[in-house]
């Protein structure tokens, strides 16, 4: 089983930011990445829809013999990972907004969270805030439209800049000195968000932490791939493969 691939999925290209972190830490692992671009974005979908889509993709990855699945999507994690863990015996690594580390480092006592509508509205997200916030004010900001702009490859357009400015403004007004990028798509806008937010605001995402957790789980199960050559990546998508390849190129993902 050591030479079996790691499975990853996201609503689209957002999980590629996590794949980048995973490749940096585990370069010898083979990966199968499923982009559900035919159903993207997940942010406006119901809990039931997100669970059903996540379950369908899990079956697809299991048919290809993966040894672990990374749910490289905050929205799918918050809505579906509990269900997946209950119904499948394989290990899942999920994405959750980095609320805990953000709360630990804020100086102003205000943390902003940029996320999809479905993430912000989710019960698990509210539980995270209740569990870790304490005296810190956590300000959620739903960002409809950002995922679609990234999926279209508009990383530096005026439309994207205007959208980022619109979503960051309430967080700055509230006094946030730390902003959590609570969607795997958003790290691809890190430079733009940093430019809008200014030098005194820290940006956090959890891609590197997810890569480390994946490494820990594989090591504990003695499933780390012993090969010394660079691992392969197989790309799967429910949408247009040519467009998916074009966006990968735009995002500088092999």
Curated annotation (Swiss-Prot):
It is an enzyme of class 5 (isomerase). The lineage of its organism: Bacteria, Bacillati, Chloroflexota, Chloroflexia, Herpetosiphonales. Coiled coil: none annotated. InterPro entries: Asp/Glu/hydantoin_racemase, Asp/Glu_race, Asp/Glu_racemase_AS_1, Asp/Glu_racemase_AS_2, Glu_race. Provides the (R)-glutamate required for cell wall biosynthesis. The active site is at residues 73, 183. SUPFAM superfamilies: Aspartate/glutamate racemase. Its EC number is 5.1.1.3. Substrate binds at residues 10-11, 42-43, 74-75, 184-185. It catalyses: L-glutamate = D-glutamate. Gene3D superfamilies: 3.40.50.1860. This is Glutamate racemase. It comes from the Bacteria. GO terms for molecular function: glutamate racemase activity. Transmembrane segments: none annotated. Pathway: Cell wall biogenesis; peptidoglycan biosynthesis. Keywords: Cell shape, Cell wall biogenesis/degradation, Isomerase, Peptidoglycan synthesis. Belongs to the aspartate/glutamate racemases family. Pfam families: Asp_Glu_race. GO terms for biological process: cell wall organization; peptidoglycan biosynthetic process; regulation of cell shape.
